């Protein structure tokens, strides 16, 4: 449906024009006639009906947003949500990109249906993982090839033109006010498309584990009551990823305790709430690489948990 239809006069003749976007110069359908007048009337009627539906939906959204706040459900800052909505519109979220790091714990809380004692702390940066072509990519699962029009960096620039790729950290984009967006990528996903400005490190073997299992998809409300989609890694693999990071020698010391707490909490959540969708069974154990097996065994020993067949 065009964004607008209007009459324009040329050489004493009225022509019906349409615009497919706000940046469109407009294209003529033809001179005024019974047919073009009918087209304009149908467009005007349809547009009016859609506006009425949108107003009705807005009222429902405001009502649900109020309920969401009263229930004190987890929410995202609006800045991050704006990025997520745009990535979703451009068919990048879930197909090419997963949300990782602390921001992912908002999704885990909603998916589990319980307040997690750690993990969902506010953060001033935004971490994404490249997943195109992996088994967790929605496009791979559905056998689709989305018609992408923008890259991750292109999406960021469309939201805030001040974003620049950091000269010191080519995997990071920074806005003029210091907001950071980082792109991480598993070695198996390299090289990235040539038109993507981000250049993530190719040596992060731990990113491979976030491309396993079954990703989680939720819709979360923002602080202002708007909606945003979240697609995050399998909570079991994220848990062990976090426990591995806590033992990684190069990891910043001030992050290690948080990593360990987040990992343990996610495994507990999977144990008690996600038996049907993300079971900690023998099949899962057999998938674990050597680097993660001892971490899972340690958690089992501490928790008194025995995987079922």
Please annotate each region the language model reported.
Residues 1-14, 21-309:
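Compositionally biased terminal segments of proteins
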């Amino acid at each position: 449906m065009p964004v607008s239809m209007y009459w324009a006069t040329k050489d004493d003749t009225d022509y019906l024009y349409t615009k497919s976007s706000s940046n469109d110069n407009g294209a003529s359908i033809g001179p005024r006639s019974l047919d073009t007048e009918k087209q304009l009337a149908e467009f005007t009627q349809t547009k009016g009906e859609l506006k009425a539906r949108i107003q009705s939906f807005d009222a429902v959204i405001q009502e649900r947003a109020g309920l969401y706040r009263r229930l004190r459900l987890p929410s995202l800052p609006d800045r991050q949500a704006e990025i997520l909505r745009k990535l979703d519109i451009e068919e990048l979220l879930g197909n090419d990109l997963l949300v990782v790091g602390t921001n992912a714990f908002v999704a885990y809380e909603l998916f589990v249906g319980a307040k997690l004692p750690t993990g969902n702390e506010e953060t001033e940066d935004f971490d994404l993982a490249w997943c195109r072509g992996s088994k967790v990519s929605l496009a791979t699962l559905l056998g689709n090839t989305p018609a992408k029009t923008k890259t991750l960096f292109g999406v960021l620039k469309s939201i805030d033109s001040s974003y620049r790729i950091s000269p010191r950290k080519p995997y990071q984009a920074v806005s003029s006010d210091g907001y950071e967006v980082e792109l991480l990528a598993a070695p198996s996903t390299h090289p990235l498309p040539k038109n993507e400005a981000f250049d993530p490190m190719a040596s992060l073997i731990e990113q491979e584990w976030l491309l396993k299992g079954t990703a989680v998809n939720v819709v979360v409300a923002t602080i202002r009551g708007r909606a945003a989609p979240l697609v995050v890694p399998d909570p079991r693999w994220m848990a062990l990823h976090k426990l591995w990071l806590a033992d990684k020698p190069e990891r910043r010391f001030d992050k290690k305790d948080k990593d360990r707490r987040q990992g343990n909490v996610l495994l507990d959540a999977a144990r008690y709430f996600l038996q049907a969708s993300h079971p900690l069974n023998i099949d899962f154990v057999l998938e674990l690489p050597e680097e993660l097996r001892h971490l899972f065994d340690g958690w089992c020993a501490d928790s008194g948990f025995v995987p079922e067949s």
